[in-house]
Amino acid sequence: GKEFVGAVWPGKVHFPDVLDREARKWFGSKYKFLLDQGIEGFWNDMNEPAIFYSEKNLNKVMKEIKAIKNDNMDMWEVFAFKDLVSGLANNPEDYKSFYHTVDGETVRHDKVHNLYGYGMTRAAGEAFEELAPEKRILMFSRSSYIGMHRYGGIWMGDNKSWWSHLLLNLKMLPSLNMCGFLYTGADLGGFGADVTEDLLLRWMALGIFTPLMRNHSALGTRDQECYRFTKTETFRSLIGIRYGLMPYLYSEFMKAALEDKMLFLPLAFVYTEDSHAREVED
């Protein structure tokens, strides 16, 4: 019966029960202030929901830290201490500690975890239809579930600056299309780790064709704006190609949306009789 207290970027917060219709309506109404400022694009982030720590678990960890404050910790105790602190974020026990109201029934969060991002984005999408019915508002989310493509797009979350994640990006595009998500894209260059110039160039070249083309990286990683590298003219050329292809890309996107088709198809979907095409994933 108590309010669950967790922490994200602003510090301690409460999480709206976006699985409840009235709560969704309340949450969606908060977009009005932003729309009134002329904002027409939204990025719903941290909506798994991510939890940096909960008040309950933080108190527990602080108590254990005080207990070992004056100890002469050996190697194993140091490792245990590190695990104690790192275990604060997104702790599975926290997701078992708060509840939702679904069709009049009380449901523990971890049982419906993947629906939270869906509910948040649905709240926003329904609000946009009411607050700005004449506009085509851009919105994409990090967390989601099947069916959320009715309200917005999805980006692929926190990847790494690895060549293997560039390949993963290629595989995820048709996979997400098959789930209904046409508006999607990755953090070009990778979100975590330090990108190389060659990797960023290759990733930007792929990004030319994805609906969301965004270079995005984490705090504490190498600055990866295009102008920070030596081949600035090559980067400029890639971005120019993107703008030059916009009419074509927009037309192909709308055809896929209106005709219930995929924007990115595996080779096997095109060459159905070619056995080799079924094995190609890059």
Task: Name each region found by the language model.
Residues 1-282:
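Catalytic-domain carbohydrate-binding cleft regions of carbohydrate-active enzymes
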